[in-house]
């Protein structure tokens, strides 16, 4: 039978060498699920709370034994006897056990680990792939990868202010080809950087992290790498950016301090800058172009660029239906970044994706900078037919694990697999 007989959590390490939570769920039938929780470096002010121990003598205060104990001592006894396939009821119970708006009592890292492990155990019990369990028989869309190949900001120790510069192989015929294109461009970029005498060490998300003369130079260099790899920028491959601008926004003067360039800009000047960049380069997506609390700035950006550029809310919406509803009502952005640990349960994650789709917003399924070998987000991308996934460069096992899982899923789906390329941007006037 699919009844839960044990839930167990332990402290393990993520891709940055920091502790995170791993949860295992066991059932009477022998079905089993394991999940590992990711962690972010640049985090939104309104994200669900990730519990850290604060004991400076253990992992510099970043231990997660409190969250682990919350699973083992509080959550586990409540879940014994539950039917593992009752995801909605279990997630509801987890939310009620915590009882706070931001999951600050038990910790989103504790709650999410359980939520994901339960889903994996249920899929194991039913002997079906996770994406099919989560999404049903119509789960068949492979996502366009948003591949972070130049890292800056909080993800790298360099002078680049913009956190991520990405490529999107929209001209590929299928996911396999998209991944090949991305990998070839990645290697081409390494060659270009070497020729320029620049550093080819990689950052948290597997992309290169060189010191560059300006943020725009990153775009120029990537275009050069795309062409060197034999692809057409703007036609076969589009560019995307994650500014993560809350990281360089100064609350005291209300301006954006681009320290790498020694420039200070107002909201309106930032919008002008993005408009200039999108006119010069084939940029199809900008994430968190302005601070998470700069709603007027986001509204202006949407008015100016929203019909031709995907404007993704990450820190702005934090995978939260209340924040997203506010954005939809006020005409802010046209896309939401989906990070499971920003909200804490699979049910709430899927609610945010559904709300976005109903409003004509796209949903981009995303990793965190502190990742693990867990590939659940790959299955979520296919389960929800989201059409886009952001999970780093084709480098580092913690990133490649997601891409390899998508290759497996594409193989399993065979001729029913779909890859929509540029049509994934249904929020734009293409």
Curated annotation (Swiss-Prot):
Q: Annotated pathway, please?
A: Carbohydrate degradation; glycolysis; pyruvate from D-glyceraldehyde 3-phosphate: step 4/5
* PROSITE patterns linked: ENOLASE
Report the GO terms under cellular component. Answer: cell surface; extracellular region; phosphopyruvate hydratase complex
Set out the biological process GO terms recorded for this chain's protein.
Answer: glycolytic process
Annotated Mg(2+) binding lies at 242, 287, 314
Major subcellular site = cytoplasm
Q: Which UniProt keywords apply?
A: Cytoplasm, Glycolysis, Lyase, Magnesium, Metal-binding, Secreted
MF (Gene Ontology): magnesium ion binding; phosphopyruvate hydratase activity
Q: Which InterPro entries match?
A: Enolase (IPR000941), Enolase-like_C_sf (IPR036849), Enolase-like_N (IPR029017), Enolase_C (IPR020810), Enolase_CS (IPR020809), Enolase_N (IPR020811)
Compartment(s): Cytoplasm; Secreted; Cell surface
Positions of the catalytic residues: 205, 339
State how the cofactor is bound: Binds a second Mg(2+) ion via substrate during catalysis.
Q: Which family does it belong to?
A: Belongs to the enolase family.
Protein name in the entry: Enolase
Q: Which organism is it from?
A: Bacillus licheniformis (strain ATCC 14580 / DSM 13 / JCM 2505 / CCUG 7422 / NBRC 12200 / NCIMB 9375 / NCTC 10341 / NRRL NRS-1264 / Gibson 46)
User: What's the source species' lineage?
Assistant: Bacteria, Bacillati, Bacillota, Bacilli, Bacillales
The gene that this protein is the product of is eno
């Amino acid at each position: 039978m699919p009844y839960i007989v044990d839930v167990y959590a332990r402290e393990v390490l993520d891709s940055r060498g920091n502790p995170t939570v791993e949860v295992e769920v066991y059932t009477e039938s022998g079905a089993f699920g394991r999940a590992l929780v990711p962690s972010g470096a640049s985090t939104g002010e309104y994200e669900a709370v990730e519990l850290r121990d604060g004991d400076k003598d253990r992992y510099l205060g970043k231990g997660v034994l409190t969250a682990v104990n919350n699973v083992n001592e509080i959550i586990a006894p409540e879940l014994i006897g539950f039917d593992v396939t009752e995801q909605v009821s279990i997630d509801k119970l987890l939310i009620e056990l915590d009882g706070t708006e931001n999951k600050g009592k038990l910790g989103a890292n504790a709650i999410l680990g359980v939520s994901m492990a339960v889903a994996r155990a249920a899929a194991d019990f039913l002997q079906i792939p996770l994406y099919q369990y989560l999404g049903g028989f119509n789960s068949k869309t492979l996502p366009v990868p948003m591949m972070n190949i130049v890292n800056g900001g909080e993800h790298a120790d360099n002078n680049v202010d913009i956190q991520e510069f990405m490529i999107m192989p929209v001209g590929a015929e299928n996911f396999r080809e998209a991944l090949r294109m991305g990998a070839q461009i990645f290697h081409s970029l390494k060659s270009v950087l070497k020729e320029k005498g620049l550093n080819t060490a990689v950052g948290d998300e597997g992309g290169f992290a060189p010191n560059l003369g300006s943020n725009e130079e990153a775009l120029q260099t990537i275009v050069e790498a795309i062409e060197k790899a034999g692809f057409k920028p703007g036609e076969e491959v589009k560019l995307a950016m994650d500014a993560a601008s809350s990281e360089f926004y100064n609350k005291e003067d209300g301006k954006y301090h681009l320290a790498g360039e020694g420039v200070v800009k107002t909201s309106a000047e930032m919008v002008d800058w993005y408009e200039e960049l999108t006119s010069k380069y084939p940029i199809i997506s900008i994430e968190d172009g302005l601070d998470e609390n700069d709603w007027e700035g986001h509204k202006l950006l949407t008015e100016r660029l929203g019909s031709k550029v995907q404007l993704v809310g990450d820190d702005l919406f934090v995978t939260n239906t209340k924040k997203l509803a506010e954005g939809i009502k006020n005409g802010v952005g046209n896309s939401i970044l989906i990070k499971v640990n920003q909200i804490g349960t699979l049910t709430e994650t899927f609610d945010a994706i559904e709300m976005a789709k109903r409003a004509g917003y796209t949903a981009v399924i995303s990793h965190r900078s502190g990742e693990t070998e867990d590939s659940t987000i790959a299955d979520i991308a296919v389960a929800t037919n989201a059409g886009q996934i952001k999970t780093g460069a084709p480098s580092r096992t913690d990133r490649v694990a997601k891409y390899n899982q998508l290759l497996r899923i594409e193989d399993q789906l065979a001729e029913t697999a779909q890859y929509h390329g540029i049509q994934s941007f249904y929020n734009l006037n293409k």
